[in-house]
Regions:
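Conserved beta-strand hairpin/beta-sheet module of binuclear metal-dependent hydrolase folds
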Residues: 1-47, 133-150
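Structured catalytic core of nucleotide-sugar glycosyltransferases
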Residues: 9-19, 56-70, 74, 92, ...
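Short amphipathic alpha-helix with an adjacent loop that forms part of the alpha/beta core around
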Residues: 44-48, 114-118, 158-161
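Active-site-proximal loop/helix segments of hydrolase catalytic cores
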Residues: 130, 146-165
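Active-site metal-binding loops of divalent metal-dependent hydrolases
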Residues: 12, 33-35, 62, 86, ...
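Active-site metal-binding motif and surrounding structural segment of the metallo-beta-lactamase
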Residues: 38-83, 164-165
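Metallo-beta-lactamase
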Residues: 85-134, 139-142
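Short, well-ordered alpha-helical microsegments
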Residues: 37, 67, 91, 133, ...
């Protein structure tokens, strides 16, 4: 696991599944869960973490390689899920999401910032063939970190956000 003011680990990246782990002293977050719940549990164990300790999963977009394990993890461990409204609509009938309690589903509006414990998270739009894909910037104290995936084009604005992280 690497550390730059945040602890983080790329659990998986590629067309077979994407999942990224981020930790601060107060929060443990997954960005996407594109593998089975069982596989993500195994990958978390490799970095000495447990899925029951996760506070939330942030969803970048509705493609299966980003949401495969989202539903099962949410149901089994009761964690909160965050995505923008169009992504939620696109996932509504997804076999990967299944039945998740409405109290676990939260809207993360694109272009907005949310505070999760000791970390601020900002979302931005991305160029990709999905309903409303987004990427996230994580900010804590004077540090920032960007998680950007599946983009077909890097705009000047995106480059500036990444460059300043």
């Amino acid at each position: 696991m690497s550390e730059i003011g945040f602890k983080y680990s790329i659990l998986a990246s590629g067309s077979s599944g994407n999942s990224f782990y981020l930790e601060t002293p107060k929060k443990k977050i997954l960005i996407d869960a594109g593998l089975s719940g069982k596989k993500i549990t195994s990958l978390l164990a490799e970095i000495n973490r447990k899925p029951e300790d996760l506070d939330a999963i942030l969803i970048t977009h509705e493609h299966s390689d980003h949401i495969h394990g989202v539903g099962v993890l949410a149901r089994k461990y009761g964690m909160d899920l965050y995505a923008n409204e169009k992504t939620w609509q696109a996932m509504e009938n997804s076999k990967y999401l299944g039945k998740v309690d409405s109290s676990q589903k939260h809207i993360f509006k694109m272009g907005k910032t949310k505070t999760f414990g000791d970390i601020d998270i900002e979302s931005f739009g991305v160029s990709h063939d999905a309903a409303a894909p987004q990427f996230y910037r994580f900010m804590k104290d004077d540090k920032s970190f960007v998680m950007l995936t599946d983009t077909g084009y890097v705009s000047d604005r995106m480059a500036g956000i990444v460059e300043n992280a």
